[in-house]
Amino acid sequence: MANLRSVFEQLNDVSLRAVIQEEAYRDIKLTIKETKTYNPYAHPVAVADSLEKLGIETNPFAVKAHTHAAAKTIELDMYKIVSFYLPKENPTTFMFMKRSKLQYFRRGPQQKDVFLNAHIEPKDVARYDVDTLFDKNVTPQITTNTAFMGDTLHFLPLTAIERIFKSSPKLQTLYATMVLPPEALHRLHSLHPGIYELEFHQEHFIYKPGGHAGAAYIHKYEQLEWIKVGRFKWADEKGLTHMVTSQILETKGANHLFIFQRGRFLTPELRCFSTETKYVTMPPIFLPKQFNARLPIKKTTAQQLFLYVKSVKNVTERDIWAKMRQLLKTSELQDYNPREVTLLVNYFLLIARLRSETCFDNVLSGGMFKKLFKPFIAWWEIQKHKIFGNEEFEQLMEALEWVDVTLTYPTKTFDNRGWVVKLEARRGYEWFADEMHKPKGPELNLEEKKTDPDAASYEKYLKALSLLQKEPEVMEAKEAEATDEPQRPEVKEEQAEASTSGRAEEIQEDPATKKGKEEPNPNRDLLCPCGLHLKIKNAEFPELPVLDHPDHLTGRKAWFFSKDGKPYSYTGGSHASRGWPNWLEKILAAIEIKEPLPEFNQCLVQQFKLQAAIPFHRDDEPCYPKGHQVLTINHSGECLTQIACQKGKASITMGFGDYYLSPVGFQESHKHAVSNTTGGRVSLTFRCTVQQNKFNDDGSMEALDNLPWKAWIPKLQNLGFQGRQLQYDPNGALISPIEEIRSMPKCKPEGVPEVVYKTLDGLARAPTPYSPNPIRARAYTSDVKNCRIGALLRQQGKEWGCRFDALVEAGKRELAISVIHGAGGSGKSQALQTLIKDNPELDITVVLPTNELRLDWLRKLPKAPQEKFKTFEKALLAPPTPIVIFDDYGKLPAGYVEAFCLYFSTVQLIILTGDCKQSVHHESNENATTSSIEPLVKEASELCRYYINATHRNKKDLANKLGVYSEKTGLTEVTHGTTPIPGLHMLVPSLYKKQAFSEMGHKVSTYAGCQGITAPKIQILLTEETSLCSREVLYTALSRAVHSIHFVNASPNNQAFWKKLECTPYLKAFLSTLREEVAQPIEEKKAEPTPVEPPRTHIAKEDAMVEYENVIEKMPEKHEREIFSEKHGHSNCVQTEDPFIQMFSHQQAKDDTLLWATIEARLVISNPKANWQEYLEKRPVGEVLFESYKRAMHLPKMPIPFEEDLWNSSMHEVQKTYLSKPENMIKNGMARQSPDYDPNVISLFLKSQWVKKMEKLGAIKIKPGQTIASFHQATVMLFGTMARYMRRMREVFQPAHIRINCEMTPEDLSSWAAGEGGHWKFKGPSLANDFTAFDQSQDGAMLQFEILKARHHSIPEDILDAYLTIKTNSKIFLGTLAIMRLTGEGPTFDANTECNIAFTHTKFNIPEGTAQLYAGDDSAIDGLPALRPSFKMIEQKLTLRSKPQVALQQKGDWAEFCGFRITPKGLIKDPKKLHASWMLEKKKGNVKNVLRSYELDLALAYQHKDSLHELLSEEELKYHYETVRSIVKSGGGGVLNTYISKDESLY
């Protein structure tokens, strides 16, 4: 081992070390996996070391606790050991064992084991099932030849073996585990203190596993005899002696596994038990005997004490006591008795005083004569000492004769025979029963099997079990048989009933009764005089489509159809082909569901006139092969069908749905005719110009001797195909299920198991020599090294890439290869999967191009270890097994397989599976070297012995159109549409469309990327890119469907719309191209109220500008007000030299100082884990908020059903709004429209604005601005749709006394508040909330509120998950943001408004019917509601804070809402704020652009004329009048003029 270790240490190559580590890791993983079953517990280090010395592995990462984990582990390990001895097939009897422990014996219900238990102790009542109990006073009979008893036999007397074997003649072998510490024979303390402890009493001793008294065993000392007995003897009534031989199979600590075998066998004469520590006992050197130290002591301790007392001069008793205390650990002191310690000290005190220098002479000194007499002298000295006493040296030697405690005992025989039998045995007459005639176990003879009910039931059980085990395979075989074999005609109900009843008289009917039946037999025979039976059958056929432009013949019209497009000519007519429409396949399918049909590639549809006829003729034109069969269908109407031969004629009337198939040779031996047709009678005649399949009467297919692939039929049958059908592609060419057959040499690589080679050779896929192409391999390694390709490999670092490239460059080798090519669904991987399933121990690595395909393999092989299956990049990071399977290898990068083989020299055999006719890997990076080399499939095709051109996936019609052989019957449904069908797997031509439709919620794959997918139904998106796809790519896409294909061609016709869609490459990814027709709303004309002329008066003219002087005087100098940053300098918010303009802060997006100050003030950086934790912690608060909101908004108690139409309408509204933007704005957002844009990434901008809030005019210090978050456009539109949808739903249930300022004009709000029947009462103070950091404070509680609200609206869960993700994972360039509201999310306004409502109603107890207005973070309530007491309980859990603003609702003090004053006359603008904003625009010279909007705002108050004296204070009137004069002088007044008469002036 030391040499091997030194060799390993000298290995400095990283790849070689990785190989060794990988091999070691596999073993470690298997070991840890096994510990989860037998040793799942956490152990202290010392205990774990003890267990490993006993051969029991311990998982160092285990955390499971147990009161006596070590003892329990040994118990389970004993079960594992005995599991290897128990029979694998036959049942075993388990005694005193719970059923739940059967798993530790690696057994299950398939063995049908028997359990025998008894209630002996009270705890047994809860442990054992009632159906397993036996009478504890009667020894049960064991009916199996093997039994097991767990940890119980040691409590029973030795006679128990006789009773068990005597009562069970079938029993041959009994396995039993016992817990008997052998050291208890010597009253030794536990030899394994970490595993168990011992406590000794006068007649009993106690075994405590793990020192835990709750699981203790109380034993008598005589029970220890079990570990010494090797044979048990007893005599039966006849005097015959029986014997059972016992032997210990394993012993670990106090746990022992015994085997008791009926009969006389050899057993070891000694029983030995191991000890971790050696013990010795001191010889008795004192009298009386009771004063000798007799308990064992550790030999190491004894040696230490002996050396100590002999190394110290004049050692005293106190010295020995001190040394004893030094040597004994504190934890060990409890194991020593003070009396024994005292006796031990006296023993060592005595030997300390004895001389250790020998008293005898040596043999080295003296001359020859002296040496000659020295032995005699020595003898004499010994004899003298015996008489007169020993010298001290001799006394010391005698005192040091320590006795080693070895725990080895001779085996005994327990003889329970009577004294007479024993006496005869001593005289040589000991009789034993003949072992050849002793009772057997379940091995019974034939007669016994017939009479033994247990054996019969057991046989039935095994048979049923085998069927259950094979059920998956049986079901697969049945499905294959159903697809391979033609379906038989259905058995009629009368026949089925007769066959099941078993009474023949029930099917005997009177002819008159048959005639009176309402449902005649649809199968009739046309009997020809020559004896030919032409069976006329009936079926329900689908309606025919309207057929135009017929060919006109005598008495009929005709339409000809053919698959190959060739015309049809015959004597008297010629027809051009009209193709082969799908409805013809449906006509044939109506018959094929009842019986198999041969191939047909032509059909003549004829519509007859009244009494039309076709004379006798044959369909034996030269274009048809000899012996071909013709199918004639009477689709509608009636006719008289006649046949004729040399012996005569026969006729029959055919009606609706009748048809017949002419037998082989009919066209050569018979003629047929049609006459007496009804008007409009339609017939279909199917023929075939190529060789047809032939079927027997029972539906089975006749064997064709001239099949080109006849020799390959056994291989096809192994794949689940019959291989006997003749099938043709659309061009009429015969489809061969086996193609591209090649012959090449075979090789059998070393290290490949025989079962693998035989499997491949049986498939005719024997390995052949292969030398990887180094040029292709270098191309791949170069791309990896230079990070041109790959995802996972790019993260391995430059060093790994260089080493990878160097090893491949230096590699040159030859290995074995087996290439398996076949169509999709041909079963090319099935044999390999079966090989892995049946041989799980094989070292095989499966490399897969995608994770989807890896999951598919795991689904098919759920019991196989997951590490066998790796994606291609991960496979390069760990050494593989000698056999590697590359499934669907065409999707691997070019050069990968070659690089893999050269990189790993341990690979001996590679198996490639794929389809050379399907798409291959495409490298999108044009700079990559691998993008310019050919795919491996071309080279691998030359190493493939044959191609399987057959499929189980596609139905025959679709497969044949693709040129593939299929025996799956039925029709593939093909539909067309302009919109995708939700839920169907969609195939698209490009990657960006895949990303786009994936974002819309579709399950999407590209044409090329769908390889390996099988779906019952698929939909294929057709675009202008479809025509650019190769044949292989289209073949891949079309071959995915099992039952139906839906083609989607969604192309809007509006050119302006197309232009806007095409302005960026990604816009179509998230826009729906459906059209929506919106009805024009019809507004009802309201009756105009009769105006009341107010008294004419004027407002005093005063200059309002002086009111701002106090603010201007207090303003500091510009740079004192600006924000300063050391990196970016001062901000630039105070602009121009005009003091009035300087009152207003101008925030600009380009101001870096202001941007960083805003980010610092408005944003909080967190991480996803903290965000999720906050969300979880505050979910209860969110539930409270939602309940308050639901009650306030009168939402129904139960969730609102989801309305798909309303969702689509909301989506179109959002898209319409987005598309209404100018084209340049859409182009500016190109990056955010890209599917590659990270949906969690947010671009931040500073909002450019003039701060016009009155409280911020002339601020001494400039305040931070407001950020705008730019999200992924698809995210914005998705959640915008969600918000729009919930808004529409909210409007349905929203009470009349609550209004949200959304899509409403000031006039609408005025009418609602103060109009006729207005909701605002003005009967007391009003309340408004002034929030602090409203957006920043919407934390996890508000997020939970939003989730609950959306879930109540039945928003799909995937959208909610996405919303949770974006809220908890949103990140900017500084990191992940905390949960908060961001301007630009999509649902910002609606979410802010609803959070405001929820918070307000949670905080205040607002009476029902109180008028309320909400808009974002603004609100106003017509009243002063009381604070809810419950709000104080959750206030500290909410980040959001609000300061109530109370208005007395009297002159000059009205409720404020969104810059409006809510007055009894309606909503008006705040006069002072309006005046200040207007003067700012005027001084900026921007009057022309804003004049009309300001005049409209002013008109809200101006229209009330002199009534303003009742609403506004004197100061407010001054501002109002000054604004009117300034606007009129600036060229306005057009709107104001509409409120005065002609003879009035504007001011």
Swiss-Prot record:
Transmembrane segments: none annotated. It comes from the Viruses. InterPro entries: (+)RNA_virus_helicase_core_dom, AlkB-like_sf, Alphavirus-like_MT_dom, DNA/RNA_pol_sf, IPNS-like_FE2OG_OXY, Oxoglu/Fe-dep_dioxygenase_dom, P-loop_NTPase, RNA-dep_RNA_pol_alsuvir. SUPFAM superfamilies: Clavaminate synthase-like, DNA/RNA polymerases, P-loop containing nucleoside triphosphate hydrolases. Residues 59-227 form the Alphavirus-like MT domain. Residues 477-495, 503-522 have a biased composition (Basic and acidic residues). Residues 599-690 form the Fe2OG dioxygenase domain. Residues 793-948 form the (+)RNA virus helicase ATP-binding domain. It holds the Pfam family Viral_helicase1. It catalyses: RNA(n) + a ribonucleoside 5'-triphosphate = RNA(n+1) + diphosphate; ATP + H2O = ADP + phosphate + H(+). Residues 949-1082 form the (+)RNA virus helicase C-terminal domain. Residues 477-523 are annotated as: Disordered. Gene3D superfamilies: Alpha-ketoglutarate-dependent dioxygenase AlkB-like (2.60.120.590), P-loop containing nucleotide triphosphate hydrolases (3.40.50.300). Keywords: ATP-binding, Helicase, Hydrolase, Multifunctional enzyme, Nucleotide-binding, Nucleotidyltransferase, RNA-directed RNA polymerase, Transferase, Viral RNA replication. Its EC number is 2.7.7.48, 3.6.4.13. PROSITE patterns: ALPHAVIRUS_MT, FE2OG_OXY, PSRV_HELICASE, RDRP_SSRNA_POS. Belongs to the potexvirus/carlavirus RNA replication protein family. RNA replication. The central part of this protein possibly functions as an ATP-binding helicase. This is RNA replication protein.
